[in-house]
C-alpha cells in the first residue's frame, strides 16, 4: 500500500496556483436626472458589474479610470407628450489623477430613444473598453 501511495505521489502533478486577474477599478460619476438617462446609466453599471476586466468602485480616489456621464431629456422643454422618451448623454473617459485634475482620454455624445438603451449601453461599454485597451497598448510600447 505504501509503495502504491509513493507511486501515485510521484506521478501526480501538483495543482497550479489560481490565476489572479486584475480587474481595473472604474468610478462612474453621473448626473442623470431624466428617466431614460437614468436607465442608460443603470445598464452601463450592470455591464461594469458583470465585466471580467473591470470592477466598479464607490470612491473616485480608488479608481484607475473615471467615466463621467451627464444626461438630459432633449424634449424636456417641449409642450405635449414628447418628454420622457429619449435622452442626450455626454460621456467622458478619464484617467484618475489623485494629485490634481484627471487626464482626459476620450468623449462621446449620444442620443438614445427609450427602446434603444440596452443596445446603446452595450456599445458604449465596448467603446470604453476599446479606448482603455488602446491606451494600455500605447503605454506598454
Regions found by a protein language model. Name each.
Residues 16-20, 96-141:
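C-terminal/domain-edge helix-coil "capping" segments
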Residues 1-9:
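Bacterial N-terminal signal peptides
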Residues 26-28, 67, 89-93, 124, ...:
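Hydrophobic beta-strand residues in large extracellular and virion-surface proteins
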Residues 8-51, 133-141:
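A structural "domain/chain start" motif
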Residues 50-56, 63-115:
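Surface-exposed short loop/turn segments
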Residues 59-61, 127:
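A generic structural signal for ordered secondary structure
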Residues 20-22, 61, 85:
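Solvent-exposed loop and beta-edge segments used for protein-protein assembly and interaction
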Residues 17-19, 56-59:
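Surface-exposed acidic, glycine-flexible loop patches that form ligand/cofactor-binding
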Amino acid at each position: 500500500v505504501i509503495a502504491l501511495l509513493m507511486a501515485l505521489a510521484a506521478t501526480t502533478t501538483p495543482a497550479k496556483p489560481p490565476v489572479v486577474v486584475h480587474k481595473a477599478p472604474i468610478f462612474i460619476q453621473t448626473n442623470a436626472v431624466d428617466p431614460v438617462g437614468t436607465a442608460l446609466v443603470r445598464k452601463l453599471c450592470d455591464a461594469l458589474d458583470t465585466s471580467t476586466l473591470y470592477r466598479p468602485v464607490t470612491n473616485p480616489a480608488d479608481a484607475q479610470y473615471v467615466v463621467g456621464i451627464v444626461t438630459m431629456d432633449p424634449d424636456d422643454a417641449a409642450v405635449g407628450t414628447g418628454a420622457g422618451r429619449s435622452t442626450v448623454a455626454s460621456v467622458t473617459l478619464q484617467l484618475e489623477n489623485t494629485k490634481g485634475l484627471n487626464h482626459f482620454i476620450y468623449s462621446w455624445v449620444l442620443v438614445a430613444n427609450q427602446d434603444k438603451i440596452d443596445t446603446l449601453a452595450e456599445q458604449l461599454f465596448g467603446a470604453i473598453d476599446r479606448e482603455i485597451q488602446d491606451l494600455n497598448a500605447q503605454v506598454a510600447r
